């Protein structure tokens, strides 16, 4: 979606309602697609990967927080939810359906791309404190992401 403030300068109330309807519909459908891929991942036996948000949304098996940006006093609604599978997902499927002789090579490929895995037990408990494994977050730096969200709020 384009920058919201640019659009508001030149549209009527009716146009604004249509813009919001379209934004809500597109964002909702993107979230439903992401959630569907996430649940299919569970049916294939894949667990949550709560570090993928720190690696360019590398997996649908994370819990994605809506990604909003702020630039020049404008909220940007592009790519609120990622589309398609991530790099971790593709390697997970490759690993799950490969011969034993190929597994080490696939794991090395994940390491070379800095693709990591952090499960629920490091991200979900009250006493968990892993800096890169948190539910409903984005980005590599939790403090910087919080600052971005606070600007938007």
Where is each model-derived feature located?
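Catalytic Zn2+-binding segment of zinc metalloproteases
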Residues: 40-55
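Generic structural signal for short, flexible, solvent-exposed coil/loop and linker residues
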Residues: 24, 35, 49-50, 82
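Metzincin-family zinc-dependent endopeptidase catalytic domain
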Residues: 1-36, 43, 66-70
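Active-site proximal loops enriched in glycine and acidic residues that flank catalytic Cys/His/Asp
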Residues: 32, 48, 52, 65
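Conserved catalytic/binding loops enriched for acidic/polar residues
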Residues: 23, 27, 55-153
């Amino acid at each position: 979606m384009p920058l919201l403030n640019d659009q508001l300068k030149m549209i009527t109330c009716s146009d604004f309602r249509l813009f919001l309807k379209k934004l809500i519909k597109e964002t909702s459908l993107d979230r439903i697609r992401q959630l569907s891929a996430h649940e299919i991942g569970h049916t294939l036996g894949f667990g949550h990967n709560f570090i993928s948000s720190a690696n360019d949304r590398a997996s649908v098996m994370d819990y994605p927080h809506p990604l909003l940006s702020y630039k020049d006093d404008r909220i940007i609604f592009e790519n609120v939810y990622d589309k398609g599978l991530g790099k971790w997902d593709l390697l997970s499927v490759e690993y799950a359906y490969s011969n034993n002789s190929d597994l080490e090579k696939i794991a090395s490929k994940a390491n070379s791309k800095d693709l990591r895995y952090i499960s629920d037990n490091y991200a979900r408990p009250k006493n968990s404190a892993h800096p890169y494994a948190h539910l409903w977050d984005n980005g590599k730096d939790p403090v910087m992401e919080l600052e971005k969200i606070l600007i938007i709020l």
